[in-house]
Curated annotation (Swiss-Prot):
It comes from Encephalitozoon cuniculi (strain GB-M1) (Microsporidian parasite). The lineage of its organism: Eukaryota, Fungi, Fungi incertae sedis, Microsporidia, Unikaryonidae. Inhibited by organophosphorus esters. A motif (DGA/G) lies at residues 761-763. It comes from the Eukaryota. A nucleoside 3',5'-cyclic phosphate 1 binds at residues 198-319. Intracellular phospholipase B that catalyzes the double deacylation of phosphatidylcholine (PC) to glycerophosphocholine (GroPCho). Plays an important role in membrane lipid homeostasis. Responsible for the rapid PC turnover in response to inositol, elevated temperatures, or when choline is present in the growth medium. One of its GO terms (molecular function) is lysophospholipase activity. Its EC number is 3.1.1.5. This is Lysophospholipase NTE1.
Amino acid sequence: MVSLSLLIAIIVVTGLLAGFRHYGSSRCRTVPFKIKSRSIEKTASTRLLGMSLEDAMKRYPLFNFYPGQSIREILSSWERVTYGNGETIAAPGFILQGLVEIWYREHLVCVKEKGSFLNGSMELLGYSTRGTKKARGSVEVLLIDASLVRDNIWYILFSMLRKSCIEIACRYFELESKLVEKETMKIKDDGQGHLDLFLSFLNEKLLLNLDDGKEILRRDIEARLIGRGETIKDSEESMDYIMYVVSGEILVLAGESAFVFGKGSVFGYFSLFFDLYSSIKIQAREDSSVLLCSSSVLLKFGLDEKKFDHSMLLDIDESLHIIDESAEWMRLLPGDMIAQKGDASKEIFYIGAGSVKSASRESSSGTVIGGKECIFGESWNESSIATRITDVVRIPSLLVDYFLERDKSFFKKYTKRLFESGNKANGKIVSIIPVGQYKDIESFSRKLKSAIGASSLLLSRRDVVEILARRAFDTTEEVRFMDYLTKMSRRYEIILIYVENEYSRLLRYLLNFSDVLLAVGTTFADIPEYNVYCRIEFVKIYEERRASDERSVKKSKKINHGPRYLESRKESFGQYDRVHHVLFPSKTMLFCSKDFQRLARSLLGKRIGLVLGGGGARGLAHIGVIQALEEEGIPIDCVGGTSMGAFIGALYAKECNNYHVFKQAKRFSRKMSNIWILLLDLTYPICSMFSGHAFNRSLHSIFGDGLIQDLWLEYFCITTNIVSYEEEVHRNGMVWRYVRASMGLCGYLPPICDNKKLLVDGGYLNNVPADVMMGMQVEKIITVDVGTVLENDHFDYGDTLSGFTILFNKFFGNKKFVTMEEIQYRLAYISTERKMKELEANGNIIMLRPDLGKYRTMDFKKFDEIVACGYQSTKNAIAKWKQEGTYDVLFFSLKKQTPKRRYSV
């Protein structure tokens, strides 16, 4: 017996020691997690239809009213009731199995299925329901104690009322006029001053219990004089204040309704709790005086959601109760699938906050998904998933049908709002972390914030912790944090959040709310692995401006026997969707903000793309175009091109220095106009006139073995694949080889062999590839077309033509004959002309066509003339834009952000 006890004691002690060792080792060693970007084509984690209880607990914040309970505890301690077909369900609950119909009078407004709540927020607040819930077949329901909900998660319950009832009613069912009418209040003048009257009203109505704080609040109330016709608040602006009319009359326009508030009126009570007046317009009907008090001021004096008078909602409109009982608020996790391609459309999804992505579009807060499919009874034409934590409200199609039947004009109003919602811009949330040995993430973040300007908000780890009240992983606080970010995103275009530790638990938390993760470092390094659906971009820091050569291929003695095939995107960028090169801090420049401004434009979606067309020596005009753009302060964020445009574009992308472009292009032109170099490269013309060796050496001497993905600017070039008869877009690989392939004019140079492909001049299929640039998230595209041949006054030589005739005419005649290179470029332009006509209709594409009619394809010896022609043509075009007023329209977003500069830096 003693030996048995001793044995048990030894086992227990050994286990404890092992546990301590494990605990100690885990404390001393940080276990990294990897951040891995997931594409929407992959299977999403959870679908919304028919969710299990386990999945629903993670996605319905309402389940947090008894935190810490497991599924087994919930199923064992909560009451489960089975209802037969047609039975009425009176209590609130969650559907474990079956279908439940919700009827309003004689109308079926909703059918809820497994994985849904039966009740709306008003029922949980203790008010009687207006609809009737009936079981369709056998239904199993998990009943909910409403008093327990009210006691434990009041904020979540209030959020449910706001998100799935009030906000939907105002934005898509046009009930804001009912709310405006209901909240109209008047203060009776009892002889006190207007300010004292307003303070007394706020104290009593909002239950503030000011006492000693009344004098402090008095100083925070704003008095404003408003002239007749002056706008106080425009539509699409948020309203978060309550207003007292001291004198005059205030006109409130809500949809098709108009309300007039006279002396003593108070308006804006609902706006203190809900963001529902964004669509109304407020202006002075006559000269007026008003007092304003914002919600941010009242929060300091104890205003919170528990002090909202819910009874004000009871008599507004019966539609509000129907919406509350039918619509459902859910909080999706990154990767959750809203709809799968081919599914029948039964619901409309309103995105309250967050982001949802499909193959063709990305939808953010304030937009609707599935509206068209629901109205016209179509199936989903593509799958959609949440890319971060996203608030969605499920609106059943039966509810829409009810409103269509009730109001014949509803279809027109609803569809108008449905399609208008997709145009609303919302702030982007960007998390910033250091990787590798880089530590100065705070300075980087502040510099980026400065480049973006007043339209950005910068938050540190400490700021986030304060917002969360040190309860970062509580569901209620997560909902509060989401609401805070949503409110800020309506005020700011970018919210920057930086975290000093890449292995921080807070980072895991923030990634679920982020649209973009910026990894900042001096060298390419793997970042921690963790599955996320947001964009992951890398910012590589330099101390001097130079073309990156970190991943360049080692030089080969024989240029034509180097690496042959294109690197895959995975090998080139690894985990990153985009790579930015940033000079910070600069060893050679005191103030260097050009790269930060470029990064800022990328995050804001305001990038400027430059597309350079092919045209042989005429392409030298691109140098003058770039110089003119730089002098006018028009930035270039990414470059693409074909043939000669690919060459000039690569030169500029390499160092962002137009002097470097000028110098290297002139050196190249000298070689191309040197008859001896050309003669030495002649070969037996079975495949081509020249072997291409001299041409290759010229390009290699300029670009070396650098890679496209290491160029300072994002770059691409176009080639024609004569094996598959398709155009190829090259975004990575060796620069000189793909520039050479893009310049490979058939008959002159042999095709480039690339992984069983034969690549020739890209101009045959796409001479000005603006369509490719359109897919690179740019706001404006400047295209330069130098290949257009405007002159057609060639001599009619008949059916045959001798080359000796052309040669003789060159010295002793003045007739104009068509040449081989001109024929090549005219052929190339046949397929391009159709694309150019389509692009001209796009308002975001700016077309430049320098007058180069007198210059031929091989006129490299006229380098200075052609460059000057491109420069002057661009300066004239910009002067014309300014005279016509189109310059401000085209580049308005760059005015305050990008300073005018004289030199490339």
